[in-house]
Amino acid sequence: MANGIIVIDKPQEWTSMDVCAKIRGVLHERRVGHAGTLDPMATGVLPVFCGGASKAVDLQLDHTKTYCARLRLGMQTDTGDITGTVLETAPVTAGEKELLAVLPRFLGPQMQTPPMYSAVKINGQPLYKLAREGVTVERKARPIEILDIRYGGSPVENEYVLTVRCSKGTYIRTLLEDIAAAMGQKGTMSALRRTTAGVYTEADAHTLEEIQAAKDAGPEALQALMLPVESVFESLPLLVAEPRVEQHLYNGCPTSRYPAADGRYRVRNAEGQFLGLANITGGVLKVEKLFVERN
């Protein structure tokens, strides 16, 4: 049984759910989920949680993501990227100097309004479905944070490369449109690649072709591409549970007078097997989530 995290280097034109469907077929495992949607035009790091590890998707500690994006000046589209319909074109009257001048304004906590072409739901309906019907609705701005933004040059005229490290829920398309507006320009996103997602980086990622080749080579080759679910929680302190405490965790029973500081822990048993997460409050140890699958 496949249990773990496969980090995929998502290709262009695939949706994040397309990737999950592919992995379900490869693993013959229905419990597959991804951590952080990438638009079809985007490429890069997409962590896919498989088997029992799928329970960790909503428990990730680090939601920070890093993107390499291209801003194209002189046009604006309905989707905020070059896959959309061009709404307006305009002469480009600003460049690198103006871009560098406005970038510091976008650092730090801020409110961002999700674009109409997004998976955000209004009354149970995804915004992108409404947008495809020509319907525009009011959206509430949401808190995000831009932790770092760096200029990476201009590979072609009127296009600028930016590397952005940001919080969960940040729409890079919207950020680039806002940056262009601050420059007094129209702008859209011409390319996007995610280089990190939480603790996972491009170095962890595998192409779908590599996944298929591993499947063809056999179960051991496929398992070798998986990262353990414990990798999600590596920043938490480690607690090693003795057999009595391990049994308490399995049974959902608290352990009183536990000799450790209050806090959240990742837990292994005496044999080094990762069991799950636990919390200690006032000397009482309680299980939060188990990931070990017992036969």
What would you call each of these model-derived segments?
Residues 1-9, 13, 17-34, 38, ...:
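Accessory RNA 3′-end/elbow-binding domains used by RNA modification enzymes
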Residues 1-167, 174-206:
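Catalytic cores of RNA-modifying enzymes
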